[in-house]
Amino acid sequence: MDAIKKKMQAMKLEKDNAMDCALLCEQQARDANLRAEKAEEEARSLQKKIQQIENDLDQTMEQLMQVNAKLDEKDKALQNAESEVAALNRRIQLLEEDLERSEERLATATAKLAEASQAVDESERARKILESKGLADEERMDALENQLKEARFMAEEADKKYDEVARKLAMVEADLERAEERAESGESKIVELEEELRVVGNNLKSLEVSEEKANLREEEYKQQIKTLTTRLKEAEARAEFAERSVQKLQKEVDRLEDELVHEKEKYKFICDDLDMTFTELAGY
């Protein structure tokens, strides 16, 4: 009987232990289920986060590609702008060189104009000198004509005296020797007068030749003055053309400077846009 009681007590104890063990196992099972559910929830949450991150990554990659494409376009625009700026600088340099050459040509034309003006002044002075000399020659010619008239008058007087001597020789034969002497004296005087007349004639011819030469020189000087006047007009025309060319080049330089300012503003706008793009990329 005691053995049965002991056995029943032992079985009851085993039962209690089994119940406790079962309760413990159930609790552990519930805890395991809770942990499993929590793990599944965390896994789903992580999956959502991973999906969101992948979506964000795709958007970021797409934005990065757009930004890179935009950056490439900006680089190309910047290169084009730099090329245009270089071309404009080259054009400005060429225009400045043309302007310098035009200024040199203008200076040369101005110097030639001054030389031509000086030559005209010298020609005018020479013309005035020739006019004065021509007046002096005319006065000398008048004086020589007067001398010639006097010589002719003296010759006529000599002829009269010769006739008188001849008549006296015919009328007074006794006074032949004295009359001959007087006749010889008259002849000598006639010879002298003829020589003087010949000299006057030669002088007159020389004066005529000098007058012809003076007229020729005057014509030459007139031709030189005409040529110099033509050259002066041509120089003035070249100077006016050079001045118009300089004004035209100045307008072209002003226009190129305006284009350069516009390109600089365009270049600044591109740089600002690039800075903004880099700032946006840095924010990502």
Swiss-Prot record:
Pfam family, one: Tropomyosin
InterPro entries: Tropomyosin
Keyword annotations of the record: Allergen, Coiled coil, Muscle protein, Repeat
Gene3D superfamilies: 1.20.5.170, 1.20.5.340
Any GO BP annotation: regulation of muscle contraction
UniProt cross-references to SUPFAM superfamilies, sorted A to Z: Tropomyosin (SSF57997)
Statement: the UniProt record of this protein carries the keyword Signal: no
Keyword flag Signal: no
Residue ranges that the Swiss-Prot or TrEMBL entry lists as coiled coil: 22-266
UniProt-recorded Gene Ontology molecular function terms: protein homodimerization activity
Recorded family membership: Belongs to the tropomyosin family.
Function: Tropomyosin, in association with the troponin complex, plays a central role in the calcium dependent regulation of muscle contraction.
UniProt note: domains: The molecule is in a coiled coil structure that is formed by 2 polypeptide chains. The sequence exhibits a prominent seven-residues periodicity.
Complex formation: Homodimer.
Protein name: Tropomyosin Per a 7.0101
Organism of this sequence: Periplaneta americana (American cockroach)
